[in-house]
């Protein structure tokens, strides 16, 4: 009988600031958030105190880079300092399997290699960035609204956010957290750029704009890191929820009523319709440029067919009249642009590269391209073992901080190739059991020249 293997799961998650409770008897004041919330207060204080001691001890050896992770037999603890004096710590259980030995006794085997530090580190950092997107930095909240407000907002956000995480599914793509760009011809791109400029000129409340088509970014006026986290929110949370809502509406009605309209545009965030309601539904509030200033803006997303335009709007809160003018101005032109892009994309899809399994990431512009986990991929999925191997190779590239190339043949006769060149990483998975190293190298070159011919890779 095969042994059942557990999956990694969240043990605890906490945020603290040592300066909030520096004296004896005030240790509980350091705690901003501790999950599970029902944990005994003495246990919380003891756990955080141990982590504080580890941080202070490791600071003596590396002041700029103290404790990053703690490995034990049953768990992995990840440390992250997002802001001065603020620490976020996440503990994950190590998967294990229980086997029955010949003498009848149960033995437990822990699978340490199933949990990668660099992957968990990326997940923890992502959780902070997502919190900051909707609430602002910790210190800003504390100074502006007080510590109690910081604690309440942290609890409200992270209790919901952490429930959405599946720790057995995270991999190299979560480390990169890149952006998929949509390549277009010059004329189409200029039309989109002119359209965006015209919108920002016509509506002075709009500070930044992003244009996406079918979950791929076409244009953005935001800073790179702000767009990175906003893109993550859009493609993993907002857009899928919108599609689910549309399908639910259709199934509940049993049919779809097509209203006569000059365009196919509608608001994804904002008023669900443009009837004369007194107060339209408030769009999400987000924070950008938090490193230099606190820009608090409203996120208005407007969709026509597969094209979505994201508008970041400053105060005051837009009126219903504002939304109506936006709809009349954007709807027809966005519908036309969506049809143009659709026609161009359909031509390119004829020469698809889905027969290859690869990941490409550019650290300079965050461009990411992958056929792994792709909904359109016609090839078989990639096993968790191979994904962990990709994570290990990338970690090696990062530790050496030099360009290089790695070829690995797995026990299942699968070839894995990793290349790093000029801040770009490229990974290919090939199921060619009888191929030798020279043949695999030629196959990778063929893939590079066919689909990345304008990108230089070291030979």
Swiss-Prot record:
GO terms for biological process: vesicle-mediated transport. One of its GO terms (cellular component) is Mon1-Ccz1 complex. InterPro entries: Ccz1, CCZ1/INTU/HSP4_longin_1, CCZ1/INTU/HSP4_longin_3, CCZ1/INTU_longin_2. Pfam families: Intu_longin_1 (PF19031), Intu_longin_2 (PF19032), Intu_longin_3 (PF19033). It comes from the Eukaryota. Belongs to the CCZ1 family. This is Vacuolar fusion protein CCZ1 homolog. It comes from Nematostella vectensis (Starlet sea anemone).
